[in-house]
Amino acid sequence: MTPNHDDDKSLPLSESVTAKDILDAAERIADGIYRSPCPPSIPLSELTGCDIFCKLDLLQRTGSFKERGARNALLLLDKSQKKRGVVAASAGNHALGLAYHGKLLKIPVTVVMPRFAPLVKVATCRRLGANVLLYGETFEEAWQRAIEIASRDGLRLIHGFDDAEIIAGQGTAAVEILEDVPDANAIVVPTGGAGLLAGVAVAAKAQRPDIKIIAVEAAAAASFTASLAAGKPVNAPVRPTLADGLAVGRVGDRSFALAAPRVDRVLTVDEQALSLAVLRLLELEKTSCEGAGAAALAALMGEAGQELKGRKVVLLLCGGNIDPTVLHRVIDHGLALDGRLWRFTATVSDRPGGMAKLTQVIADAGASVLEINHDRAFSGPEVFSTTVEVTVETADQDHIQSLHERLREADFEVISATGSR
């Protein structure tokens, strides 16, 4: 691949990255990229009904597949570009990949990160030596700022998902997947700006035209879906999402041109599905995945799982950089969705034994009390009753219903409840 396919105006965008480019990139970056495993998953296969393999690209040194494209792009710079350095806009993982490999290759890196970027990614990027600027409420605003810096300082601007070098680097994941699982029926790819999707689709379809490529977007940022409907890249609204790495309002022109004719299906997943997928990966695979990385499993736990039942499916777990505070909230949210946490408000007697009676009913039902808060002052007109808010650990939704019935039978009025259906 030439250092920049943009220079070859004769190439249509749909052919601007080839399978040979990706194979060349795989050889070029091999000594600096971890060749991540793609093992079978018995628990996820049982969960989905598919024969599941997990491409663990979250095991890269900076926690995501983005290192592949970053290293490829940096290695293809000329000497003067390497000396001056590069600039990029990123919500986190592209920035981390550039910062890490820039440090290894002694190339200065500046990254503009939107203000919603996870704190753990911002801190790690700075620790790796990059010059980090927080700017803008959206990726697009951060990108415009990066363009200004590139023009002002003479830096090479490296797009996180639309440069040919980046796409070729990301496609090396598919080369490894088909080496490890040559008879895979489908690869499920988390999709934001579509650089990973484009690279995987080009590489996989060149080797196995029959393989299914399934793109998965967050419903809160479904720019590829909108672009397919329009027949060209278009802007799409972006709402806050657990899959912050997929929060892109417009897919890349090159990425779209490469991916659109090669993708077999595009699915969207909501925030509840993402939360449950993060929880399932943590419990069943002992893998801490960010929202974007869990998107592939979220899709398989829904509509895609029914369509691919019994088929050999590779889930691309593309990132593991989740902020610990976010992970804590996601676990609690996922447990509540699962019926394993239940919070209810009830009225109890404010006389000796009232609280003991409530906790005994809960214990007899086989539930565990995690937290109790009671409020005497603002519990209403009854002097000898009080409102309590109780959080309990339960087994599932049926267990919640059973506990609810026991509370009613014991004359406890459940005023409100969350975590039950």
Predicted regions and their residues:
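PLP-dependent amino-acid enzyme catalytic core
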Residues: M1-R421
